[in-house]
Each structure stands twice: as C-alpha cells, then as structure tokens.
Curated annotation (Swiss-Prot):
Ubiquitously expressed. Its main location: membrane. Residues 1-19 dip into the membrane without crossing it. This is ADP-ribosylation factor-like protein 8A. It comes from Homo sapiens (Human). It comes from the Eukaryota. Keywords: Cell cycle, Cell division, Cell projection, Chromosome partition, Cytoplasm, Cytoskeleton, Endosome, GTP-binding, Lysosome, Membrane, Mitosis, Nucleotide-binding, Protein transport, Synapse, Transport. One of its GO terms (cellular component) is late endosome membrane. The gene is ARL8A. Plays a role in lysosome motility. In neurons, mediates the anterograde axonal long-range transport of presynaptic lysosome-related vesicles required for presynaptic biogenesis and synaptic function. May play a role in chromosome segregation.
Length: 186
C-alpha cells in the first residue's frame, strides 16, 4: 500500500514539479564521455568525435528531469580540474574504456585519487565501462575487480557495462541517475 502511495505521489509531483540534477562526467581521454553525452541528448552515435578541450556543459531534459552535465576533458593536463567540477553535484559519472586494458590501471588510480579529495566525500559515483561491444572488453564483474571498486566504502557506488555505439544499457544508466537524484533530495 505504501509503495502504491509513493508511486502516486511521484506521479503527482511529476505533473507539477520539474526535477533538476547536476552531474560531472570524468575519465581518461578517449573513454567515450562526449559520445555518452551525445547519445543521451540525441540518441545518435557519431564515430568522429574530437577530444574535449577543457570542458563542455550541456543541459538535457528527459521527461520531467533536467540534467546539467559537465563533460570534462580526460587528457592529463585537464585532470586537475576534475575535483572543482565534481563538488556539490548529484553524482559523479566516471567513464572507463573497458576495451583498453592497458589504461585500466591509470584509470583506477585517477578515480581513487579523485575520490580521496575531502570536498567530494559522500558524492555517489557511477562507473561506466564503455565499449562493451569491442572484443576483450571487461564486463561489470571484471571492472569492479580491476578498478578496485569494492575498496570505496564512503559513498554509494554503482557500475554498469555499456556501449554508446550500440546504445546498450544507456537506459538503465539514466534510470539509475534519475532515481538517484530523487533519493538524494528525499
């Protein structure tokens, strides 16, 4: 009965109130961050992406939720900016190229260094292993192990294996983020 009431209340709120969430998307260069933003925004995959220089900000509306998405460059010279753009957001989305196993160790180190920053304590993290359509790509279980995600105890953390190219698991990623946005405000 309570679950039914909560669903009815959510539906009623959706009629009258727009929800907003702010996300920061970080990860090493060529992991698919900008592609992810474009797939969410337009449903289109573009093979010819140019690496992000600095950052891009995009607002995307899905249903009654407006998502303000900060897409931060992944080259070494931009990584010092990650912390600043991650402060106070609803969630941090950390993109990993799951098919490039040579960069997994560096990706793990960058993630853990970022999450060690005191200003980011408690902010939830969604780790996305992109490019699951490529041969040799790590699955969720392997990503959790190689990225040492089980060591992250001070916040909510979730991991999905996705393919921006094939649009695999993009919908559940959005559902998690939107649901998470609702639970953070409750």
């Amino acid at each position: 009965m309570i679950a039914l009431f909560n669903k009815l209340l959510d539906w009623f709120k959706a009629l009258f109130w727009k929800e907003e969430m702010e996300l920061t998307l970080v990860g090493l260069q060529y992991s698919g961050k900008t592609t992810f933003v474009n797939v969410i925004a337009s449903g289109q995959f573009n093979e010819d992406m140019i690496p992000t220089v600095g950052f891009n900000m995009r607002k995307i509306t899905k249903g009654n939720v407006t998502i303000k998405l900060w897409d931060i460059g992944g080259q070494p010279r931009f990584r010092s900016m990650w912390e600043r753009y991650c402060r106070g957001v609803s969630a941090i989305v950390y993109m990993v190229d799951a098919a490039d196993q040579e960069k997994i160790e560096a990706s793990k180190n960058e993630l853990h260094n970022l999450l060690d920053k005191p200003q980011l304590q408690g902010i939830p993290v969604l780790v996305l292993g992109n490019k699951r359509d490529l041969p040799g790509a790590l699955d969720e279980k392997e990503l959790i192990e190689k990225m040492n995600l089980s060591a992250i105890q001070d916040r909510e953390i979730c991991c999905y294996s996705i393919s921006c190219k094939e649009k695999d698991n993009i919908d559940i990623t959005l559902q998690w983020l939107i649901q998470h946005s609702k639970s953070r405000r409750s």
